[in-house]
Swiss-Prot record:
It is found in: Cell inner membrane. Pfam families: HlyIII. Keywords: Cell inner membrane, Cell membrane, Membrane, Transmembrane, Transmembrane helix. The chain crosses the membrane at residues 28-48, 58-78, 96-116, 121-141, 144-164, 175-195, 210-230. The keyword Transmembrane helix applies. It comes from Borreliella burgdorferi (strain ATCC 35210 / DSM 4680 / CIP 102532 / B31) (Borrelia burgdorferi). Belongs to the UPF0073 (Hly-III) family. It is a multi-pass membrane protein. This is UPF0073 membrane protein BB_0117. InterPro entries: AdipoR/HlyIII-related, Hy-lIII. One of its GO terms (cellular component) is plasma membrane. One of its GO terms (molecular function) is pore-forming activity. It comes from the Bacteria.
Length: 233
């Protein structure tokens, strides 16, 4: 209730685009585009799975789609408010929390469908447990350093390497390429995010724009993996 009351104190004047730095406006618009694509993509995946009467696919794609859409929604809201505003600090926390959810949400279809056994379930439990721990950590420590956040995201993203053989076996060479390509681009994005904190504001802003573009490319890569390959299992 307290958080709801805080949010009610803000009006549309807080979203005056003249107060938003150019890079923040770019980040908002680019990830608003991500919201639209995520909703369309989720609808396609769920519709295909429903028509094929694949209940497991429907569930895991809903989880994946929700996590992807949530990330772009939180990122858009975070970047649209002026720097220094209280509501921006609130959405900064939500923005980081949504990254943990996206990582776990992307793992869900891959592990549940490509590794449908005990080992796949174990990986899922580990990743979702780390996501929950990460969420709790972000709630308690809002201003944790960028290098720490980026490092945790990268480590979570590559836990899948422990089950790389069955996944490689399940996917074709091209399917495996999109999995790895997306992971590498996400990783590069994480590194860019970490390094951007070490430069002056002007360079930082430009690197942050690059970071946002890389996130869109990586999520598009993994969506193609879901649509073209995983949905056909």
């Amino acid at each position: 209730m307290l958080r709801e009351n805080k949010l009610k104190n803000y009006s549309l004047s807080d979203v005056n685009t003249s107060k938003i730095p150019k890079n923040e406006l770019f980040s908002s618009i680019s990830h608003l585009f991500g919201i639209i694509l995520s909703i369309i993509g989720t609808t396609i995946l769920v519709t295909i799975s429903t028509l094929k009467k694949k209940d497991l696919h429907v569930v895991v794609f809903l989880i994946y789609g929700f996590s992807m859409t949530l990330l772009y929604v939180m990122s858009t809201l975070y970047h649209i408010f002026p720097k220094g505003s209280k509501i921006k600090k609130i959405f900064r926390k939500f923005d980081h929390i949504s990254i943990f959810i996206l990582i776990a949400g992307t793992y869900t279809p891959a592990c549940a469908i490509l590794v449908p056994n005990k080992s796949g379930l174990i990986i899922l439990c580990i990743v979702w447990s780390l996501a929950i721990i990460g969420i709790i950590f972000k709630i308690i420590f809002t201003n944790s350093p960028g290098w720490f956040n980026g490092s945790i995201f990268i480590i979570m993203g590559w836990i899948i390497i422990f089950k790389i053989k069955p996944i490689y076996k399940a996917l074709s060479g091209k399917g495996f390429f999109w999995l790895v390509f997306g992971g590498i681009v996400y990783t590069i994005g994480g590194i860019v995010y970490i390094l951007s904190k070490k430069f002056n504001p002007t360079i930082n802003m430009k690197m942050h724009d690059v970071f946002h573009i890389l996130i869109i490319i990586a999520s598009a890569s993994h969506f193609w993996l879901m649509l073209k390959y995983i949905s056909n299992f």
